[in-house]
Amino acid sequence: MAALTQKKTCSQMMEEWKEFMWNPRTREFMGRTGSSWALILLFYVVFYAFLTAVFSLSLWVMLQTIDEYTPKYADRLANPGLMIRPKMDTTEVVYSTNGMNGTWQAYVDNLNSLLKDYNKTVQMERGVNCTPGVYNMQEDTGDVRNNPKKACWFFRDVLGDCSGVSDTTYGYQDGKPCVLIKMNRVINFLPVPIKELSNTSITIKCTAQNNDDLLGSIQYFPSVNNQSLGAIDLMYFPYYGNRAQQNYTQPFVAVKFLNATKGVDHMVECRVNAANINNQDPRDLYQGRVIFTMKIDRL
């Protein structure tokens, strides 16, 4: 009994381990002969090759059902939303005009970075001159793709006082900040203008949710109706997708707040006006509109 329970010495365990790794008598490596290792390796090669083939075939079949230029399902994008620039961590434009540019320089830098692609030299290289007031239709012919599709020019000069050309601080230094509004891109979407407002553009209007008198006067660039509404020309629609229209230029409406009351949190709501865009849905506050906070601290 004592012999059965006797512990193996370290040298015995090392010998057993060496014999397991390579047994010269049976010519086995880790308990298997060379032919056994070859068979098991062949099995796994065939097994994983089969799995790879099945996965590749499934992926290929799925890709045949997908249009690489247009998403198959886009029902949730029927009503595009709006976004603001400068783009910061939150939808807030809060700064001070006390002469120190540390509170507003980040907004200026953000707008400079955004609008550098809207310089005339860049736009003339990437886009073409389109006919204002009409859709920029570039239809395909059957299975023949009309690609790459051309993009219309959008020069930063049309943003007027908010272009960063005449006023390099976009009004932030003087307490008259500019905010750029853009509409989210939806492939093949054709907004229908409201003819009472404009025949050639969809319009954007910004108001205060709390008190319009405190928000003061607003200028829009580009605009219609004597600058009472911002305007996005129909020639920037439709958008055909990044793959088909790689140089597409996103149009903006610049909103300049001329005399907003300082030291007040202004809840600003901007809506896009088009016959086929719903901007009144109480369940989705960002459908056809955008809401942001603006505050200009007192001197």
Swiss-Prot record:
The GO molecular function terms of this record are:
ATPase activator activity
Q: Which Gene3D superfamilies match?
A: 1.20.5.170, Na, k-atpase alpha subunit
**Entry's transmembrane regions:** 37-57
Subunit composition? The sodium/potassium-transporting ATPase is composed of a catalytic alpha subunit, an auxiliary non-catalytic beta subunit and an additional regulatory subunit.
Q: Which residue intervals are topologically Cytoplasmic?
A: 1-36
Record-given protein name: Sodium/potassium-transporting ATPase subunit beta-2
| Membrane-side (Extracellular) residue stretches | 58-299
Q: In which tissues is it expressed?
A: Expressed at a high level in bladder epithelial cells and eye and at a trace level in kidney; it is not detectable in significant amounts in the stomach, colon and small intestine.
Q: Which GO terms describe its cellular component?
A: sodium:potassium-exchanging ATPase complex
- State whether keyword Chloroplast applies: no
Q: Which InterPro entries match?
A: Na/K_ATPase_sub_beta, Na/K_ATPase_sub_beta_sf
Q: Which UniProt keywords apply?
A: Cell membrane, Disulfide bond, Glycoprotein, Ion transport, Membrane, Potassium, Potassium transport, Signal-anchor, Sodium, Sodium transport, Sodium/potassium transport, Transmembrane, Transmembrane helix, Transport
